[in-house]
Amino acid sequence: MPRPTGKKFDKRRQQQNPLFKRKKFCRFTAAGVEQIDYKDIDTLKDFIGENGKITPARLTGTKAHYQRQLDTAIKRARFLALMPYTDQHKA
């Protein structure tokens, strides 16, 4: 049986593709941030996964300069007990 082809099929296939890549951009460059602050916990939480790991720049689209600052800010916030090192523990 031949595979379905045509304009309609291609459009539907693109919409259903779970790996469809959206154009990534650096949030910090767009906002004009010069320095990432370790006290801004709400921003830092966006860059930490469910398991407590720092999300890599290739997934978030953050530029290398800001990714290094982000890494340092998260580590400082963890050291000062502003953020947890791991996810929520189930007792």
UniProtKB/Swiss-Prot annotation:
This is Small ribosomal subunit protein bS18. Part of the 30S ribosomal subunit. Forms a tight heterodimer with protein bS6. Keywords: Ribonucleoprotein, Ribosomal protein, RNA-binding, rRNA-binding. GO terms for molecular function: small ribosomal subunit rRNA binding; structural constituent of ribosome. InterPro entries: Ribosomal_bS18, Ribosomal_bS18_CS, Ribosomal_bS18_sf. GO terms for biological process: translation. The keyword rRNA-binding applies. Coiled coil: none annotated. One of its GO terms (cellular component) is cytosolic small ribosomal subunit. Belongs to the bacterial ribosomal protein bS18 family. It comes from Paraburkholderia phymatum (strain DSM 17167 / CIP 108236 / LMG 21445 / STM815) (Burkholderia phymatum). Binds as a heterodimer with protein bS6 to the central domain of the 16S rRNA, where it helps stabilize the platform of the 30S subunit.
